[in-house]
Amino acid sequence: MTLRLYDSATRAVRDFEPLEPGKVGIYLCGATVQGEPHVGHLRSVIAFDVLVRWLRRSGLDVTMIRNVTDIDDKILAKSAEAGVPWWAWAYRHERAFSDAYDAVGNLPPTYEPRATGHVVEMIELMQRLVDRGNAYRGKDGNVWFDVRSLADYGSLTRQKLENMSTLEEESSDKADPHDFALWKGLKPGDPETASWETPFGRGRPGWHLECSAMAYRYLGETFDIHGGGIDLRFPHHENEQAQSHAAGYGFARYWLHNAWVTAGGEKMSKSLGNYLTAAEALGRVPAVVLRYALASVHYRSSVEFTEATLAEARVTWERIAGFVTRAAELTGPVGDDGAARLADVVLPIAFVEAMDDDLNVSAALAVLHEHIRLGNTALSSGEAGDAAAELSAVRGMLDVLGLDPLAEPWVGEASATPLRGAVDVLVEGVLADRSAARAAKDWARADALRDQLAAAGVVVEDSPSGARWTIKGT
């Protein structure tokens, strides 16, 4: 089956055909590092991490670009309010984003360009647009993109100009209210360090210009996939496409957008004040549980983020990790070389078909859980060969989702909380006493100890390699 992806531009699921056979270029709009990362930020990065993993598992060479917007009006305002240099404020929060992305197991991008490191490319693109008649100089060093100069403006979101919301900043300097800033002239009170010299005067780049210039720098005039949150479609992505098309570039061939994380049915966002920071979420559950909660829902469906969502994800993850751990103890892991061997695992056809169907993770997880059921049956009956085969398939599928319990960084994650650690110690102590009773052929005491554990919800399974235990319902 050919990989099919939902293209937001055509509003249809399309066969994915790379621009260059065997290679894929992806540009993902990264963070504007104005504050702490929240759960919504993690959802977007995890969704595209799964895409990258699947493309690579399918044999494609992926170049993944995820930018950092480290110069922005909000960064300047918040840093000034805090009495901190804008660049220090941006860098501090950039590190917080990177740490959060790493914590939930995302692969690093091929390149992670900062906007401030690519101002030269932005000025060159801006000059090109002015020369081609698509941009004009306003007052005070501002440079505006002329939306009426581009016939297909609005094509990404299928809007006519007269019906569009005016979300760009108001200014008497503009020829049309919908025109947007390519460059913002230095204003009184702005820090001199947050500006660069151009033929049009000193200032700083507009948000939309930044992404077009960085995408061109790393992926060229035309590339395969542009991604981001659904809230970026307009005006950001519409304006990115407009700039790049006006410059004569093909830009993105497929547009992918992930849905929101919601709280109480509303988008989780800083502006609404209903968000949970990444640090707060990671303080509630292990990082792998948070990843499972965000990755287990189709990327185009919203995730309602509640305590029940996290609790369900925790139970499911512990069931997954429990099987993998028990099976690996009996049969050994897939191989000592870990990732290399997992990449060679033949994945179940139904799993492949689900992932090729616009990354249908929900259907893929149904296949995963069926193989875990078969694996548990094999373990119970002592069929080591069948258990090993199921372990191989399960770990291969989990690797695609970034959820393999035996891979970094998840080794030991299922028992990482202090409570689970304490339970481990107590249960292992009782099992040691039971083992001693069995060795002494004190069957009554051995049975009593097992009943004691059962009353506490701990299920004990005896096997040739010793007793294994799980918590009932996990």
UniProtKB/Swiss-Prot annotation:
EC no.?
6.1.1.16
Q: Which reaction does it catalyse?
A: tRNA(Cys) + L-cysteine + ATP = L-cysteinyl-tRNA(Cys) + AMP + diphosphate
Entry's SMART domains? DALR_2
Name the source's superkingdom: Bacteria
Give the matching InterPro entries.
Cys-tRNA-ligase, Cys-tRNA-synt_Ia_DALR, Cys-tRNA/MSH_ligase, CysS_C, Rossmann-like_a/b/a_fold, tRNA-synt_1_cat_dom, tRNAsynth_Ia_anticodon-bd
- UniProt entry keywords in alphabetical sequence: Aminoacyl-tRNA synthetase, ATP-binding, Cytoplasm, Ligase, Metal-binding, Nucleotide-binding, Protein biosynthesis, Zinc
Q: Which CDD domains does this one have? A: CysRS_core
User: Any note on cofactor binding?
Assistant: Binds 1 zinc ion per subunit.
Q: Where is ATP annotated to bind?
A: 270
Gene Ontology cellular component?
cytosol
Q: Which cofactor does it need?
A: Zn(2+)
Report the subcellular localization: Cytoplasm
Keyword Aminoacyl-tRNA synthetase applies: yes
Output one GO BP term: cysteinyl-tRNA aminoacylation
Task: Kindly list the positions annotated as binding Zn(2+).
Answer: 29, 211, 236, 240
Q: Where is this motif: 'HIGH' region?
A: 31-41
Where the record places motif 'KMSKS' region is: 267-271
For this protein, the record's PANTHER family field holds: CYSTEINE--TRNA LIGASE, CYSTEINYL-TRNA SYNTHETASE
Family in the record: Belongs to the class-I aminoacyl-tRNA synthetase family.
Q: How does it assemble?
A: Monomer.
Output this protein's name. Cysteine--tRNA ligase
